[in-house]
């Protein structure tokens, strides 16, 4: 990824794995999305009406995360996933996020949009792992699936199919 984004995403991932708020893990004055030079947090947006370009590490990581999450939703909605299974899935998702953070190279603008998505994804993963007191793990899985789908709406990824989230 772009160097400044890599630092922020690394801090975001470390905070999520440690169970702290990403905003608390960032350097002072730099929340989880703070490398925007105009002071506003990055927002989800297209690249002049087009999806953002991706690279192989990002596409591969998101494909693997989709494959991990999609088959679990029906069982989660039915209450058939236990705490350990959620924690195991969260650990696998955290590995994928770490791989993306370490290996993908995006433009600074695309990187900023990806930060928003990965922040939502890692917040859901943290809750699934039990690192967010009182969180509903099934709802957290839906949050992760929604973040994966958001990626598909904002990033070019030939063949990407959104996850059916229905209840």
Features from the language model and the residues they span:
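Short, solvent-exposed, charged loop/turn and helix-capping segments
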Residues: 96-115
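Immediate post-signal-peptide N-terminus of mature secreted/exported proteins
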Residues: 26-81, 163
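Helix-rich interaction surfaces within compact, conserved domain-sized segments
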Residues: 103, 114-167
């Amino acid at each position: 990824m772009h160097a400044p984004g890599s630092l922020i995403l690394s801090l975001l991932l470390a905070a999520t794995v440690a169970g702290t708020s990403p905003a608390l893990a960032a350097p002072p004055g730099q929340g989880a999305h703070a490398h925007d030079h105009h002071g506003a947090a990055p927002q989800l947006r297209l690249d002049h009406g087009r999806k953002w370009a991706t690279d192989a590490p990002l596409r591969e990581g998101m494909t693997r995360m989709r494959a991990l999450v999609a088959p679990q939703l029906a069982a989660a909605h039915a209450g058939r996933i236990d705490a350990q299974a959620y924690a195991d899935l969260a650990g696998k998702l955290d590995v994928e996020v770490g791989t993306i953070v370490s290996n993908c190279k995006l433009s600074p603008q695309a990187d900023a949009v990806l930060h928003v998505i990965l922040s939502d994804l890692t917040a859901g993963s943290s809750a699934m792992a039990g690192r967010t007191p009182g969180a509903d793990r099934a709802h957290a899985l839906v949050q992760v699936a929604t973040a994966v789908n958001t990626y598909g709406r904002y990033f070019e990824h030939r063949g990407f199919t959104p996850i059916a989230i229905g209840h």
